[in-house]
Curated annotation (Swiss-Prot):
Name under which the protein is recorded: Early placenta insulin-like peptide
Main location: secreted
SS bonds (residue pairs): 31-125, 43-138, 124-129
Transmembrane segments: none
InterPro entries documented for this protein: Placentin, Relaxin, Repro_Hormone_Insulin-like
Function: May play an important role in trophoblast development and in the regulation of bone formation.
The UniProt record lists the keyword Disulfide bond: yes
Residue ranges the record assigns to the propeptide: 59-114
Subcellular location: Secreted
Signal peptide limits: 1-25
């Protein structure tokens, strides 16, 4: 009886994956015949699994995409921002590091203001169709 189950398991898996693939293709065809070209030009590596949202298909990767500076250049010296955790570091080196922190925060904040709410995510792409619907794909 168990061998019968294992022989049917690949067929069931193929049937279910085909049904999902056809339903996705039907939704993506609503964007027109040129959708594939746009998908290739915007997404180098699209993911194959999607979930539906009101704005279109979406897979949220949940990965944060924020660049964090790890060094501060003050008076020609490059100091790591994590150097305060080094036990044998002299107080002379720790002092310029603490003085440099406000300027480092100011640079990071100004970067965030310039980028606005639209961040470039190398793992996602969004294709907007002519009818106003959008498709967002994330790896």
């Amino acid at each position: 009886m168990a061998s019968l189950f294992w022989s049917y398991l690949p067929a069931i898996w193929l049937l279910l994956s085909q049904l999902l693939r056809e339903s996705l293709a039907a939704e993506l065809r609503g964007c027109g015949p040129r959708f594939g070209k746009h998908l290739l030009s915007y997404c180098p590596m699209p993911e194959k699994t999607f979930t539906t949202t009101p704005g279109g298909w979406l897979l949220e990767s949940g990965r944060p995409t924020e660049m964090v500076s790890t060094s501060n250049n003050k008076d020609g010296q490059t100091l790591g921002t994590t150097s305060e955790f080094i036990p044998n570091l002299s107080p002379e080196l720790k002092k310029p590091l603490s003085e440099g922190q406000p300027s480092l925060k100011k640079i990071i904040l100004s970067r965030k203001k310039r980028s606005g709410r639209h961040r470039f995510d190398p793992f996602c792409c969004e294709v907007i169709c002519d009818d106003g619907t959008s498709v967002k794909l994330c790896t």
